[in-house]
Amino acid sequence: VLGIPGLFSTLGLRQTSDGMTVHGGEGTLDIVIRMLAGLWGAGRAPIAVEFAPLTAGQVIDAGDFTIDCFPVRHRDTDSFGFVFQSPARRRLRPHRLMALGVPDGPLRGELAAGRPIVLADRTVDPEDVLGPPSGGRKLVVIGDTETTEGLSQYVADADMLVIEATFLDRDAPTARNYGHLTAAEAASFAATNKVGQLVLTHMSGRYEDEEILAEAANIFPNTRIAADFDRIVL
């Protein structure tokens, strides 16, 4: 949230004509609106901006993937986690296309899109030539949260889980007081829900990253610490 004014300023200097929609809980949006108004005046942000309140269970269609929003508990804030999911796709099976005499070209595109085609001597249904679903990916991002209770339904079998790990387990009482998780809790949650990879964020400056990583990796080996400009392929 605190980085939004800087982002807006940069985009304004570039004289972008694109607008931006800020999604968030009511409390979060109120903070953003007041920050922007304090810097540039009410309704005078350097780029066009809209504000879209989030609700639990809301699904945003982003074209190639969907974003599912779910509530998480972090003190008295209206915080959310997010499931980014791309659909599994069914690919054409070349040997079936050849066996049924489907030529290269637009007809194969019709079948790939799930529509039957008519040849000179037969009708070919997509089910005749499509393979099983494959390739869908699931990324779950959870920021500040004081508990993972009730979140397994969103996280189970994710290819990647990005989640906070503010404290070490030796400071679990402090984590409870401030509404955060320990590295061990984050790792145990990942292991229980059979995620593919765990990426940790929001570590307290009182620890070295290596300490956080060691505690988590002891429970869930496929763990890494998030860093600016990371690129990770799911």
Give names to the regions the model predicted:
Residues 1, 74, 202:
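Histidine-centered divalent metal-coordination motifs
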Residues 1-13:
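Di-metal (Zn2+ and/or Mg2+/Mn2+) metal-binding site signature of metallo-dependent hydrolases
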Residues 4-7, 32-36, 151, 212, ...:
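Hydrophobic packing residues within well-ordered alpha-helices of enzyme cores
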Residues 11-17, 40-45:
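Arginine/glycine-rich "motif VI" loop of SF2 helicases in the C-terminal RecA-like domain
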Residues 19-27, 162, 199-201:
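Short internal beta-strands
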Residues 38-54:
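A glycine-rich helix N-cap at a beta->alpha junction
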Residues 50, 56-57, 148-234:
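Binuclear metal-ion centers of metallo-dependent hydrolases, dominated by the metallo-beta-lactamase
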Residues 65-141, 145-154, 160-162:
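Active-site-proximal loop/helix segment associated with metal-binding centers of metalloenzymes
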